[in-house]
Amino acid sequence: MNKALPKAIFLMGPTASGKTNLAIELRKRFPVELISVDSALIYKGMDIGTAKPNAEELLQAPHRLIDILEPTESYSAADFRRDALKEMDDIVAQGKIPLLVGGTMLYYKALLEGLSPLPAADADIRAQIEQEAEQFGWEAMHDQLKSIDPVSAERIHPNDPQRLSRALEVFRISGKTLTELTQIKGDALPYEVHQFAIAPKERAEIHRRIELRFANMMEEGFEAEARALYERDDLHADLPSIRCVGYRQMWDYFDGEGTLDEAVFRGICATRQLAKRQITWLRSWKELTWLDSDDIDGALELISTQLEKK
């Protein structure tokens, strides 16, 4: 008889949907340990603008894979999968259930489905692409991608140079499109995964929460936190850490683009767009149970019922 797979919980959702609060409540009721699934929370010194769980919350529910890198460093979906699997194995060895909580959908996908055999980054080719973009513009580079890989071009916005550059880089290195290569799957996750997504029923409520969160961040000193990063000699606007929503807009403000109020407004708009993309991705997710962030007791009951199923 096959040995039963260990359980794991995915707690997904758009930004500002209440994932952290629900995760803390889950830890009070179930033998779970938390793993952060967030491409911004990995960075040290980026606490306020990422809405990182505060000291009290981390005391109640420690999160693994938070504060593991300097903002100068990069971190891929492959890096996350490697680290998350290690943490999950450690949690299971303690007789507990891994609870993965966050909103970086690409990380969840990589963990659940395995990774496609994409080529490693090539600094020379990346530099060549960036040089072409500087000469012709990212719109022209997007047109180039459209002629090679229309499926990826449909998904990638011309104003997303990181993903656009990567799609072109993959083709130039391998001779195959990103679409072709991502259809080849890696190893599936060896866990019995219970997948949940938490969000308010009304989109307007997400917008309200985002605005409130941004206002709170500014009161807590986000401008000073972002400026401290801006004044470091080892950081620049093209790093993944500084491209995080909120930080990118503050960086532009420090560079002289507009007023502080305008930077805050742009940050709110960018966060709304992020939430919209997260929800769109989740709507296409398979085997997902939706939870109402305005009914935490109901959410806990639903999760409890699912975990008790064999």
Swiss-Prot record:
ATP binds at residues 13-20. It holds the Pfam family IPPT. InterPro entries: Dimethylallyltransferase, IPT, P-loop_NTPase. The keyword Ribosomal protein does not apply. The keyword ATP-binding applies. Keywords: ATP-binding, Magnesium, Nucleotide-binding, Transferase, tRNA processing. GO terms for biological process: tRNA modification. Residues 38-41, 162-166, 243-248, 276-283 are annotated as: Interaction with substrate tRNA. The record marks 104, 126 as: Interaction with substrate tRNA. Substrate binds at residues 15-20. It comes from the Bacteria. Its EC number is 2.5.1.75. It catalyses: adenosine(37) in tRNA + dimethylallyl diphosphate = N(6)-dimethylallyladenosine(37) in tRNA + diphosphate. GO terms for molecular function: ATP binding; tRNA dimethylallyltransferase activity. Its cofactor is Mg(2+). Catalyzes the transfer of a dimethylallyl group onto the adenine at position 37 in tRNAs that read codons beginning with uridine, leading to the formation of N6-(dimethylallyl)adenosine (i(6)A). PANTHER family: TRNA DIMETHYLALLYLTRANSFERASE (PTHR11088:SF60). Belongs to the IPP transferase family. Monomer. This is tRNA dimethylallyltransferase. It comes from Aliivibrio fischeri (strain MJ11). The lineage of its organism: Bacteria, Pseudomonadati, Pseudomonadota, Gammaproteobacteria, Vibrionales. The gene is miaA.
